[in-house]
Amino acid sequence: MSEIKDVIVQGLWKNNSALVQLLGMCPLLAVTSTATNALGLGLATTLVLTLTNLTISTLRRWTPTEIRIPIYVMIIASVVSAVQMLINAYAFGLYQSLGIFIPLIVTNCIVVGRAEAFAAKKGPALSALDGFAIGMGATGAMFVLGAMREIIGNGTLFDGADALLGNWAKVLRVEIFHTDSPFLLAMLPPGAFIGLGLMLAGKYLIDEKMKKRRAKTVVNEIPAGETGKV
């Protein structure tokens, strides 16, 4: 149970692929102009990570070490192709918005990295959980960045959600404030860099506060007579 909890915590926060490892920067910065696009690509990446980790872990004993990387890429490419066809069939609007960034998941360092660092060494169930946790951590970071840029740039949230979830999702659109002209800095790549920098700073501050809180807890748990001992 502790190993499962550690995998989840590492994937979602401590070893977050976007905010700690800084992997997958190309789609993170390019696609997160809206919360819907960010959520769509994040969920697609999560599905790819989960399925590829599961497949690679299952086949790890029969995978020759010398050619493991090409085999990993073939497996990842097959899964990405299947996910791309699913998005094309059931969320065509999102498919058009994401464009080339769906097939580019094949070359995403997050996917290849987890295959090599985790799935090739652990069992299928734990590897699938790792892929899911890492994917959801990346999705969360992408969603927060996309929501921030969409709100500042257009004054809306979940604009175009029907492209991802269907016609019923039009009711999810929220107009936070009205603007006749979008704030282009937030919508363009420089805004993505600024937003990511703010998120990195925010995570650092949260981690520092958590460290101080844990240190205080440890000090309070030490008996008064032992605090002066070396």
From Swiss-Prot:
Pfam families: Rnf-Nqr (PF02508). This is Ion-translocating oxidoreductase complex subunit E. Belongs to the NqrDE/RnfAE family. It comes from the Bacteria. Its EC number is 7.-.-.-. Part of a membrane-bound complex that couples electron transfer with translocation of ions across the membrane. Required to maintain the reduced state of SoxR. The gene is rsxE. It is a multi-pass membrane protein. NCBIfam families: PRK12405.1 (NF009070), rnfE (TIGR01948). Its main location: membrane. The keyword Hydrolase does not apply. GO terms for biological process: electron transport chain. GO terms for cellular component: plasma membrane. It is an enzyme of class 7 (translocase). It is found in: Cell inner membrane. The complex is composed of six subunits: RsxA, RsxB, RsxC, RsxD, RsxE and RsxG. Keywords: Cell inner membrane, Cell membrane, Electron transport, Membrane, Translocase, Transmembrane, Transmembrane helix, Transport. The chain crosses the membrane at residues 18-38, 39-59, 63-83, 86-106, 128-148, 182-202.
